[in-house]
Structures are given as structure tokens and as C-alpha cells.
């Protein structure tokens, strides 16, 4: 049978199906009130709803942003990146395995990649505290410290105690 001959048959079969039993994926419902005036403050969680509406959970309650503000959704969510916990980020997309998430322009999220812009990453550290270690400096510091200790012991004429503490077998 050609695809043209199957079309009426498949259409009739589709109409005969009981659509009440077909599982449907429903978008999460958002809160009823839409915020239009002030930016969110101290919000700690967000969810994407139907028609690109974003709902933020804040201490004052849930604040929603309407579909007309889709250009701002990315900016709205990124304002709260410092207050998102690692667990909240993980619960958004568990397949990312605690790695940062990337926020698309329309509010969708995906697992972050190495070359993504850092300003749109959720769950990434803004800066990693570090300390440069100069190995030569560490050796010199250790030698200087030992020499200072030896000099202080020599003043007190307790060189034998110093040798024992430092583990040297001086003869």
C-alpha cells in the first residue's frame, strides 16, 4: 500500500481512539499574579511555565513574569544566580550530574558546556579562590626557618637539643 492509501485509514483510526486515556504532558502552572514593576529580590528558586512564563520563588511569595517579557527572562533568572544552591540547580536538570546549567535566551535550560558564556551559567562559581604556590619559595622559606631556629638555639647553647629536634645527625 502506498502512503496515500493509508492516510484515510490512519485518520479514521485516530478519530476512533479514546483520547481521554492518552497521557498528556502538561506544563507547570504558574501563579496567578504577574509582576510588572519591580525586579525580584532575594529569590531562591525558579520554574519555567507554559508560554515562556517564569515564576520565581522569593521570601515574599511567588512572582511571575508574563510572556510579553520573554526578552527579559534570561536577565531575570540570572539576577538570582548567587542565591541558587547547588541542590536547586541539580534538581532543575538531574542529568547534568551537578554540573552548571546554561540558560538559553528563551528561558530553557540545558547542561553547560566549557565554551558557554559565564554570565548565563547557573551553578558555576563566579571565581575560584586560589593561591599561587612557588615551589622554590617554599624550599627557601623552610631553609630560612631552620636557619633562624639554629641561630636561636646557638644563642642558648643548646645545639644538641636543636640537632635532635631537626633530625640531623651532625658529628
Swiss-Prot record:
Its main location: virion. GO terms for biological process: entry receptor-mediated virion attachment to host cell; symbiont entry into host cell. Keywords: Host-virus interaction, Membrane, Viral attachment to host cell, Viral attachment to host entry receptor, Viral envelope protein, Virion, Virus entry into host cell. One of its GO terms (cellular component) is virion membrane. It is found in: Virion membrane. It comes from the Viruses. Plays a role in viral entry into host cells. Forms a pentameric complex at the surface of the viral envelope together with gH, gL, UL130 and UL131. This complex is required for entry in epithelial, endothelial and myeloid host cells. Mechanistically, engages host receptor(s) including neurophilin 2/NRP2 to mediate infection. Additionally, monomeric UL128 may interfere with certain inflammatory cytokines to increase infection and dissemination by blocking monocytes migration. Belongs to the HHV-5 UL128 protein family. Forms the envelope pentamer complex (PC) composed of gH, gL, UL128, UL130, and UL131A. The pentamer interacts with host NRP2. This is Envelope protein UL128. The lineage of its organism: Viruses, Duplodnaviria, Heunggongvirae, Peploviricota, Herviviricetes.
